[in-house]
Amino acid sequence: TIVLACNAYLEKLEKKIAGKIMPINNFMLATEPLDEDEARYINKDNVCAHDNKFHVHYFRMSQDNRLLFGGGENYTTKFPSNLKSYVRNTMLDVFPKLEKKKIDFAWGGTIAVTVNRMPHIGKLDSGVYFSHGFSGHGVAMASLAGTIMAEAIDGLSKRFDVFNEVKIHAYPGGTLLRW
């Protein structure tokens, strides 16, 4: 049994499904520690949160009261030269009161996004299982997809069949407009 679990790194390994994801770079930052009042102003219930914009912003507080903020992406093979500044500008659109706060860390990675933001989990005619297109939810969804594919390979396909039936459309142009 073969399983393709490449997410954004599928590239041209399997052309039948490569056009159904768009690899994008997504970035995060961590501010300097905020005092308790600042932290509660930003996130009074200390929960993970995100908005519903096309380019999603997401955030939570760390144990030491740093704002962990994700937002800002690009569609090239390179990360911005000043990642802290790049993400900071996006953060300030959401939290302008943090203008004077220092950014201690910034990082990023490449994710795979589907047109409808649903994960693409299925089986090719050749019998190859695949999962990708977690659209920024890969930490949780990739583990679930692995479990679902393992169940299907073991003959328990009920949950797999649900995802396999979800129609994932290809991006216009497929892989032609990629890096």
Predicted regions and their residues:
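C-terminal lid/capping helical subdomain adjacent to the catalytic/cofactor pocket in oxidative enzymes
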Residues: D125-F130, F134-W179
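Active-site substrate-recognition segment that forms the wall
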Residues: T1-E36, R40-S126
